[in-house]
Structures are given as C-alpha cells and as structure tokens.
C-alpha cells in the first residue's frame, strides 16, 4: 500500500540518519554541551555570597479584607569585586528571598579596588541615607554597620572605614552604599581623562598598594 511504502521508506538510510543511533548521539551531544554550561553557571552561583538584610511584612487592603505578603532586601556578590542588590516580594518569605536574589544578580556591577580596599574616599546618597566610605590599610577590617557591612563583604572589600551620616533605615543605607561604590574610579581612568601620568594622579601609598596587590596576584 502507498501508505505502508511511505512508512517503510522512512526506515531506510535517510531515516536511520535522523532517527538511528548516530542521530540520537548527535542530539545527545548537543544536550551535553548545554548541560555543561548550566553546570558551570550553577557552580558559580553556589560560590556567591548572599546576605538577607531586611525582611518586612506588608499588607494590602482589598474588598475581602487584608492580603499579607513579605518583602526581602538581599545582597549578592562573588567576594571578588562583583556585587548586586535585589528587592523581592512574595506571599512567602523563601519566595521573596529568591526573587531578591534573582534581581540582585541582574544588577551586578564591578567595584574598583586596590588590594583589599577601595581606590579613594567617596560619599553616596539615596533618599535620606548618606554613607561615607574611606580606604583603610591592610588589617583594618570592615568598620561598618550591619546594612553597609553586608554590601561591602559581598563585594569582597576586607579593609574599609564606613560611616552612616543620614537615615538608619536599612534600605536607605544599602542603596546609599551602592551609590557610593558606583562612584569609585580607577586611577588609570582618572589619569587617562586628565592626560597625566599615573604618578601625578595617584598618591604614592596607593601606587605601593597597587604594586603589592599585583605581586600577590602573581
């Protein structure tokens, strides 16, 4: 029958190429490549630092009464200069934290550093929050409050002086700290913009710390 001949023809050499062992192996190989990428991404995410700064319960008044949900402010970083802040909202606390983590990863940014501290003093503002950051010598540690400390530690900054000059609200402090970190510049960028050699822009102590950090990296 014509229909049977068409089905039999699908099992010929052409059919074997698409549905036989070789075709299955090719498809399986492509899946392995994709799976390998996923595994690498998952491994990188597992090595990231996560800090939950604040969890709040909020309510919404509707016709049937009140609907309660939770918000979570989360900091995520790789401990090596990469950090992000996320704000999640859900009916359950774990779901709110997970949403905050995902949002923080989408907003990753790189923090310029020299060794274990920042490149220069800076001040950031967000709403009523004002945070001042100053570089510190090795061994000083992170001198900062809870909300700012979470951001700095996730970014991988080990020596720094931080002071909150405005609101003590955790959300304002976190966003002010992030605003300060985003203002940091590398000495090379400043020297290139001014058209001057690096020695005329960066202090001698910064150059020594930079050289020591480069030597330790080797």
Curated annotation (Swiss-Prot):
Which keywords accompany this UniProt record? Ribonucleoprotein, Ribosomal protein, RNA-binding, rRNA-binding
Domain named S5 DRBM: residues:
48-111
Which Gene Ontology terms of cellular component type are present? small ribosomal subunit
Region ranges (Disordered): 1-45
Source species: Nocardia farcinica (strain IFM 10152)
Q: How does it assemble?
A: Part of the 30S ribosomal subunit. Contacts proteins S4 and S8.
Question: Which named protein is this?
Answer: Small ribosomal subunit protein uS5
Q: Which InterPro entries match?
A: Ribosomal_Su5_D2-typ_SF (IPR020568), Ribosomal_uS5 (IPR000851), Ribosomal_uS5_bac-type (IPR005712), Ribosomal_uS5_C (IPR005324), Ribosomal_uS5_N (IPR013810), Ribosomal_uS5_N_CS (IPR018192), Ribsml_uS5_D2-typ_fold_subgr (IPR014721)
Protein family per UniProt:
Belongs to the universal ribosomal protein uS5 family.
Q: Where is the composition biased (Basic and acidic residues)?
A: 22-45
Gene Ontology terms for molecular function: rRNA binding; structural constituent of ribosome
Described by its record, this protein's role is as follows: With S4 and S12 plays an important role in translational accuracy. Located at the back of the 30S subunit body where it stabilizes the conformation of the head with respect to the body.
Gene Ontology terms: biological process = translation
* PROSITE patterns hit by this protein: RIBOSOMAL_S5 (PS00585), S5_DSRBD (PS50881)
Top-level division of the source organism's lineage: Bacteria
Q: What is known of its domains?
A: The N-terminal domain interacts with the head of the 30S subunit; the C-terminal domain interacts with the body and contacts protein S4. The interaction surface between S4 and S5 is involved in control of translational fidelity.
